């Protein structure tokens, strides 16, 4: 197995995930879901039946798969997609062709200072992977903040019930 820098590995994983999310999704491949008919119909607050979103008949609007393809073609023309795929393939080949060698601590220290012992000077995968990892951190942190806000809200709303649970810990009393 080849040893590679974290930035190149992150770029490789990012490329694989993006490729599989775009080309591996059922909507992108044009698959249609069968009409799922539950035994009991679902009604909204006014008593009107809810629409079955998995129906195969359309309402005069294109299918989600065609809308996704149209949006993808609109925002990413074929030339730009080819360039992006070429860049990804080049980075992927570079990672796969890298010789397997154990790096010394001095090499890792030099790399931290911006010095790449075996790489080229025009390697710009570092900023891309840094931006990607920053985005992952931001997403994770915002998800954590949302979870904490929900917990705080539920503690405020269900505070009385929560206190009852703690108070009656050994006894089984239905609360809900």
Swiss-Prot record:
Q: How does it assemble?
A: Interacts with ADCYAP1R1 (via N-terminal extracellular domain); both PACAP27 and PACAP38 neuropeptides function as ligand for the ADCYAP1R1 receptor, which modulates the activity of downstream effectors. Interacts with VIPR1 and VIPR2; functions as ligand for VIPR1 and VIPR2 receptors, which modulate the activity of downstream effectors.
- Lysine amide: residues bearing it: 169
PANTHER family membership: GLUCAGON-FAMILY NEUROPEPTIDE, PITUITARY ADENYLATE CYCLASE-ACTIVATING POLYPEPTIDE
Which PROSITE patterns does this UniProt record tie to the protein? GLUCAGON
Segment Important for receptor binding: which positions?
Answer: 150-158
Region Disordered, as annotated, extends over 98-135
State the protein's name: Pituitary adenylate cyclase-activating polypeptide
């Amino acid at each position: 197995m080849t040893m590679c820098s974290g930035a190149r590995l992150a770029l490789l994983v990012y490329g694989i995930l993006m490729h599989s999310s775009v080309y591996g999704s059922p909507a992108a491949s044009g698959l249609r879901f069968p009409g799922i008919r539950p035994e009991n119909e679902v009604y909204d607050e006014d008593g009107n039946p809810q629409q079955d979103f998995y129906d195969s008949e359309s309402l005069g609007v294109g299918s989600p798969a065609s809308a996704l393809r149209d949006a993808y073609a609109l925002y990413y023309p074929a030339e730009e997609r080819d360039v992006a795929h070429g860049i990804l393939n080049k980075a992927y080949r570079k990672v796969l062709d890298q010789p397997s060698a154990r790096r010394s601590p001095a090499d890792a220290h030099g790399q931290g200072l911006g010095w790449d012992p075996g790489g080229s000077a025009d390697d710009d995968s570092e900023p891309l992977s840094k931006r990607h990892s920053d985005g992952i951190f931001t997403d994770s942190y915002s998800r954590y903040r949302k979870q904490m806000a929900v917990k705080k809200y539920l503690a405020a709303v269900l505070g009385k019930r929560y206190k009852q649970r703690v108070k009656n810990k050994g006894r089984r009393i239905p609360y809900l």
